[in-house]
Amino acid sequence: MNTLIYLIPVALSLGGLGLVAFLWALKSGQYEDLDGASWRILDDGDGEGESSQTL
């Protein structure tokens, strides 16, 4: 029972820290462009100004 006195506040503080990190990510715009990465991975990179390397 003595360990619960330490574990409960630690668990609550870690949960609060995770919530603060999530809210910071929302506020800083981390979730603004969800489709951009999926389109960039499909891009060939053959645009102007980019050099394409072939083997």
Swiss-Prot record:
Record lineage: Bacteria, Pseudomonadati, Pseudomonadota, Alphaproteobacteria, Hyphomicrobiales
Function: The four proteins FixG, FixH, FixI, and FixS may participate in a membrane-bound complex coupling the FixI cation pump with a redox process catalyzed by FixG.
Keyword flag Transmembrane helix: yes
Protein name as it appears in the record: Nitrogen fixation protein FixS
Gene Ontology cellular-component annotations: plasma membrane
UniProt-annotated location(s): Cell membrane
Gene Ontology annotations of biological process type: nitrogen fixation
UniProt keyword annotation of Cell membrane present: yes
